[in-house]
């Protein structure tokens, strides 16, 4: 029997791009999407430096074990907050990492003046959908459309 004990140390906003962050996205993004490559160092730098995005990372036993991107932007009807690209390393799943990332994002959106936080999640991501519902997210009666360029 293998016992995995994890200690979530903290969730933080990435302030700079270093080898650790680049390497973390190199192993995390393939666990989220097989159709999109991990962001390059330059793309990560653009994300971290953008006033419209917060790159959150969760550390477990000192190692980056999860990430979430919080996109915030103002439109005529108010400040919008969107949670995007939530990914937790397979070895750390089921230990509260995703919950910690989402709670941090919700609180940060609230602190910055948003009144709602939106996200999308594929139906096949059953564990993630249960987490979102447990945290208080509710399905909206809306359609999501995509135009591919």
Feature locations, PLM:
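Conserved GNAT-fold acetyl-CoA-binding loop/helix
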Residues: 16-46
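Conserved active-site alpha-helix within GNAT-family acetyltransferase domains
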Residues: 99, 103, 111, 123-141, ...
């Amino acid at each position: 029997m293998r016992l995995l004990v994890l200690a979530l140390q903290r969730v933080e906003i990435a302030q700079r791009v270093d080898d650790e962050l680049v390497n973390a996205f190199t192993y995390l993004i393939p666990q989220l999407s097989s159709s999109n490559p991990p962001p390059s160092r330059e793309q990560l730098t653009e994300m971290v430096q953008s006033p419209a995005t917060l790159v959150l990372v969760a550390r477990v036993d000192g190692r980056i074990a999860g990430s979430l991107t919080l996109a915030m932007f103002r439109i005529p009807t108010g400040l919008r907050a969107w949670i995007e690209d939530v990914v937790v390393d397979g070895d750390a799943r089921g230990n509260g990492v995703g919950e910690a990332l989402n709670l941090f994002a919700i609180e940060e959106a609230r602190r910055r003046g948003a009144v709602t936080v939106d996200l999308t999640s594929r139906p096949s991501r059953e564990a993630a959908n249960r987490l979102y519902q447990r945290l208080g997210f509710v399905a909206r009666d809306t359609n999501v459309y995509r135009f591919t360029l």
